From Swiss-Prot:
The keyword Nucleus does not apply. It comes from Myxococcus xanthus (strain DK1622). It is a peripheral membrane protein. Binds 1 FMN per subunit. The active site is at S181. Substrate binds at K71, N116, R117, M118, G119, F120, N178, N183, N248, T249. The gene is pyrD. One of its GO terms (cellular component) is cytoplasm. Pfam families: DHO_dh. This is Dihydroorotate dehydrogenase (quinone). It comes from the Bacteria. The keyword Cell membrane applies. One of its GO terms (biological process) is 'de novo' pyrimidine nucleobase biosynthetic process. Belongs to the dihydroorotate dehydrogenase family. Type 2 subfamily.
Length: 363
């Protein structure tokens, strides 16, 4: 069914199709009964062994939605109806901003990929907070992904993140510092150890005041060198973060394509292995002590399974959802359960980081 819908949507520009899809999910969310029914159907193939706990949050299964799809918390209920164990909104900034000029979103179907240079387009933290206050149904964790406004000087970026914490942290279940988007000039410099430590320290300090105990995650780029990943992990642990989200989009172009010259972040299948490499490195650096939410190139249960084995505790999707449609979660879960059983794992937590364990070691 979605194949036909996708064919029609793919006749439109990528951004117009996105707006139509979000509008549909928004209107779906107006019917609580329908949302609950659809979610129940999507989770039929999710046995209890698929549940996992990260930073004190319970995920019904390890397949969650990444930030970027619902920037303004307009379709949270409709997205939960699709079966996601968690939904992450944003990236949100203190003040509304239009983002970069269009066209700014491009499909590359033959590579199962997207290129975007959206530029943190959003209605601002205050408006998103108002929507979250009206929410009455939350069957799983809701994450709030925050960033800085484009016109905020880098040396004042901390103020923007703290302002977002004030507005949004009490309303979400976890907070994500996005310091890795390639579409806000200079933003990735915040991943450098000294600046990152200052930023995370300030955010943690404010969180302790406005939302004590709220888990804080950091979203990082797939383009970091192995040594840079080590530095980020060390800073994250020093600042007592709940975990990392690995990874954002890449500026690399590992193929020839007419659209490859377009500026922006590449997501989808080409990011799968670079993201997995960052997950492995981060897991090894922390000895498995720092939880990781893996994202990048997830389309199938096998993709989810590989990220879990590499060290992720939860796996997020975005581009895969665009290509696979609203039935994606329901299609993945039964096969994921089969993969776990095939390899002798009774629970998701048993397979996390499994590829790093020596043969014969206990699960």
């Amino acid at each position: 069914m979605y194949g036909l819908t996708r064919s029609l949507l793919f006749q439109l520009s990528a951004e117009r199709a996105h707006r139509l899809g979000m509008a549909g999910l928004h209107y779906l969310g107006r019917s609580r009964d329908l949302c609950e029914s659809l979610r129940e159907k999507a989770l039929e193939g999710a046995p209890p062994g698929l549940a996992v706990e990260v930073a004190g949050l319970r995920f019904a299964h390890p397949v969650a939605l990444a930030a970027g799809l619902d920037k303004d918390a307009e379709a949270v209920d409709g997205l939960f109806a699709c079966g996601f164990s968690a939904v992450e909104i944003g990236t949100l900034t203190p003040r509304p901003q239009p983002g970069n000029p269009s066209p700014r979103l491009f499909r590359l179907p033959e590579h199962r990929a997207l290129i975007n240079r959206m530029g943190f387009n959003n209605h601002g933290a205050t408006q998103a907070a108002a929507r979250l206050r009206m929410q009455t149904w939350r069957p799983g964790p809701l994450g709030v992904n925050i960033g800085k406004n484009k016109d905020t000087p880098l040396e004042q970026a901390v103020d923007d993140y703290v302002a977002c914490v004030d507005a949004l942290a009490p309303l979400g279940d976890y907070v994500v510092v996005n310091a890795s988007s390639p579409n806000t000039p200079g933003l990735r410099k915040l991943q450098e150890p000294e600046q990152l430590g200052q930023l995370l320290g300030a955010v943690q300090e404010r969180l302790a005041t406005v939302a004590p105990g709220k888990p804080l995650f950091l979203k990082i780029a797939p383009d970091l060198s192995p040594e840079a990943v080590d530095e980020v992990v060390d800073v994250a642990r020093a600042q007592k973060l709940a975990g990392l989200i690995a990874t954002n989009t890449t500026v690399a172009r590992p193929f020839e394509h007419p659209l490859a010259k377009e500026a922006g972040g590449l997501s989808g299948a080409p990011v799968r292995e670079p993201a997995n490499a960052v997950i492995r490195r981060a897991w090894l650096r922390s000895g498995g002590a720092l939880p990781i939410i893996g994202v990048g190139g997830v389309f199938t249960a096998q993709d989810v399974y590989e990220k879990l084995r590499a060290g992720a505790s939860v796996v997020q999707v975005y581009t895969g959802f665009i290509y696979e449609g609203p039935g994606m979660v329901g299609n993945i879960l039964p096969t994921l359960a089969t993969l776990l059983a095939r390899d002798g794992y009774k629970q998701v937590r048993d397979v996390i980081g499994a590829e790093h364990r020596k043969p014969g070691a206990p699960n």
